[in-house]
Amino acid sequence: MAKRVQVVLNEDIKSLGNDGDLVEVAPGFARNFLLPNKKALPVTPTVLKQVEHRRAKQAEKEAAKKQEAIDFQTALTTIGRFTVKKQVGEDGVLFGTVTNGDVAEVVKEATKKDIDRRDISVPEIHGVGKYKVQIKLHNEVNAEINLEVTSY
């Protein structure tokens, strides 16, 4: 009896791999769990061709997303500076702080494009001034914007 069998995964499985990966598993695991639950397919030449085709399409999509992120990064640097207006006390200290949501809102107003607030890294801002803010646009593309905090 074979020690390991090869299967192609149909979905992401946490401890095993991602959709489309070719993995070696125990024959019982493949026979009793992966194959009956349609979480994997046995390896055949046809399945391997489908996997290659799917990977090529995925690579094209990923390249397009990366290019879009690079274009957006260029747009952000072209704009240069974003301004957030906050209420300030007499000594120049903000009431509250500048949050990721505030930055996302200002960027959306200027570029008409949504940014997930969780992808924005804002330093601790407690006063009026100029700050650098990091925005993660893609796994490999980050943008740094200049943020000016003013009073209203």
Swiss-Prot record:
Q: Which GO terms describe its biological process?
A: translation
What does this protein do, in the record's words?
Binds to the 23S rRNA.
Organism, as annotated: Prochlorococcus marinus (strain NATL1A)
Q: Mind listing the GO molecular function terms for this protein? A: rRNA binding; structural constituent of ribosome
Annotated keywords: Ribonucleoprotein, Ribosomal protein, RNA-binding, rRNA-binding
PROSITE patterns in UniProt: RIBOSOMAL_L9
The UniProt transmembrane annotation reads: none
> What family does this belong to?
Belongs to the bacterial ribosomal protein bL9 family.
Q: Which SUPFAM superfamilies does this chain map to?
A: L9 N-domain-like, Ribosomal protein L9 C-domain
Cellular component aspect of the GO annotation: ribonucleoprotein complex; ribosome
Q: Does the keyword Ribosomal protein apply?
A: yes
Q: Name one Pfam family in it.
A: Ribosomal_L9_N
Protein name per its UniProtKB record: Large ribosomal subunit protein bL9
Task: State if Glycoprotein is listed as a keyword.
Answer: no
